[in-house]
């Protein structure tokens, strides 16, 4: 369930200093399309109208909002409400979009747990855009309760915890994602960044080295290994990695700027936490 491109989600977190510079990606063009949400009318006309509404929501969200709201008034049900939510998201009304995604998930009752998990996941992504990482993590926890075998949900919640600088929780979620998706370079790099921010350069080095055994020219993994080596006093190894990054990436890229900072001996400094993580709670029943 990857509703936003992973690189785009990193950008949304505004963690370029704390997490890999892969964050510098284009702003996402839209949330992933779901099947029509209304359990009352799944006929071909309903599906056609839903798809048309979603296309408009992504391309011209301000035009799509009144169209979707009118459709809802005509009995479009949950599918129309979902189109409203996506249009709100694309129009930058992230808090309202998150509330709408949550409301749709709740109003579905106990039906279609996989679809409800996607809706909670979309709510989490909208909360991240709204700068509410704590609410994002809560929504993502609801999604995980419904679909705990989806590694993307664990990654998303790990990124929300990273936005709160709750590094042990972020690492734990990346651990779980790696169990579900072994040897994934992207997750290894994310966990390396989390270990680095948790002041454990040895574990960061291990994850970065593992990623580089799979993808030797992965610029973010090279940066993570370089910064971990820098902390551990291995300046020659660090410089080798930073120089390799400069050969691989455009000179005006964020990765290049980070590599240049590393060559000067500078370590990335994470930004302030967006919000404080909620205290751990016992697992709830399915919502």
What are these regions (language model features)?
Residues 83, 122, 156, 190, ...:
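Canonical tetratricopeptide repeat
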Residues 46, 78-79, 112, 117, ...:
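Helix-start (N-cap) detector for alpha-helical repeat units in TPR-like alpha-solenoids
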Residues 73-74, 107-111, 146, 180, ...:
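Structural marker of alpha-solenoid helical repeat scaffolds
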Residues 22-83, 92-99, 272-287:
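N-terminal leader/linker segments that initiate helical-solenoid repeat arrays
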Residues 60-63, 93-100, 130-139, 164-176, ...:
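Structural signature of tandem alpha-helical TPR/SEL1-like repeats
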Residues 52-54, 86, 125, 159, ...:
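Residue-level recognition of tetratricopeptide repeat
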Residues 70-71, 103-104, 142-143, 176-177, ...:
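Canonical positions in the second alpha-helix
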């Amino acid at each position: 369930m990857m509703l936003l491109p992973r690189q785009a989600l990193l950008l949304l977190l505004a963690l370029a200093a704390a997490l890999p510079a892969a964050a510098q990606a284009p702003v996402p063009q839209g949330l992933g399309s779901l099947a029509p949400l209304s359990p009352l009318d799944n006929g071909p006309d309903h599906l056609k109208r839903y798809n048309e509404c979603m296309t408009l929501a992504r391309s011209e969200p301000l035009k799509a909002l009144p169209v979707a709201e009118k459709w809802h008034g005509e009995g479009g049900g949950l599918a129309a409400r979902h189109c409203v939510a996506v249009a709100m998201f694309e129009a930058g009304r992230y808090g309202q979009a998150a509330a709408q995604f949550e409301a749709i998930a709740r109003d579905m009752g106990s039906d279609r747990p996989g679809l409800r998990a996607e809706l909670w996941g979309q709510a989490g992504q909208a909360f991240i855009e709204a700068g509410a990482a704590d609410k994002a993590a809560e929504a993502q926890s609801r999604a995980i309760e419904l679909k705990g075998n989806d590694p993307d949900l664990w990654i998303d919640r790990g990124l929300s915890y990273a936005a709160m600088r709750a590094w042990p929780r972020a690492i734990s979620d990346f651990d779980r994602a790696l169990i579900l998706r072994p040897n994934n370079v992207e997750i290894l790099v994310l966990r390396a960044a989390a270990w680095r921010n948790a002041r454990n350069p040895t574990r960061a080095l291990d994850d970065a080295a593992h990623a580089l055994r799979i993808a030797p020219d992965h610029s973010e993994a090279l940066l993570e290994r370089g910064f971990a080596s820098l902390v551990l006093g291995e300046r020659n190894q660090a410089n080798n990695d930073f120089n390799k990054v400069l050969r691989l990436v455009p000179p005006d890229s964020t990765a290049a700027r980070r590599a240049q900072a590393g060559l000067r001996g500078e370590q990335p400094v994470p930004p302030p936490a967006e919000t404080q993580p909620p205290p751990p709670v016992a697992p709830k029943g399915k919502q």
